[in-house]
Regions:
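Conserved cytosolic headpiece of P-type ATPases
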Residues: 1-171
Length: 171
């Protein structure tokens, strides 16, 4: 993410999964933008790990994106707002998705935990179409965000092209 000094708005310009790196265009909180990988347009709906990353960005988050008098604004934390906007740029409707997917449990970010975690009802098959089939038909999903070092240290697998792979030095 990067801060735009002239607008005082946080904007996500790049995201990275285990195997891919994407650039995101657009300015401010306007949910219009394009995802590019090595200069070529990418549809998040056709990239399992990008889609799941964007769902995590939106659903492990308390910010609200809204438009007032033609101007897009965020209610809540600017960093969480930037994550909400990048999910919207990826084709996820924030209001509809947060209304559909129920948050069952929340462990808020604290300076001790250095992460936020939510347990969600994952019954919406269209949204969660990229869940690995090896997980079975689970109605629950846990999303977390926080310190990359802490999260990587607690992770054993990564999604690569829709498949779970052991998280090792190569990834």
């Amino acid at each position: 993410k990067t801060g735009t000094l002239t607008q005082n708005k946080m904007v996500v310009q790049q995201v990275r999964s285990a195997a891919h790196q994407y650039q995101i265009s657009g300015e401010g909180y306007d949910p219009k933008g394009e995802f590019l990988e090595q200069g070529l347009g990418v549809s998040p709906q056709n990239s399992p790990e990008l889609w799941m990353l964007l769902l995590n960005a939106l659903l492990c988050n308390d910010a609200v994106l809204q438009q007032e008098r033609g101007e897009w604004m965020i209610l809540g934390d600017p960093t969480e707002g930037a994550l909400t906007v990048v999910a919207a740029k990826g084709g996820i409707n924030p209001a509809a998705t947060t209304a559909t997917v129920k948050r069952l449990v929340e462990y808020p970010f604290t300076s001790e935990r250095k992460r936020m975690t939510v347990v969600l009802n994952a019954a919406d098959e269209a949204l969660f179409q990229y869940l690995p089939s090896t997980w079975g038909a689970t109605p629950y999903l846990l999303f977390t965000k926080g310190s990359p070092e802490l999260l990587l240290d607690r992770s054993s697998q990564a999604m690569v092209n829709g498949e779970l792979r052991p998280l090792d030095e190569q990834l």
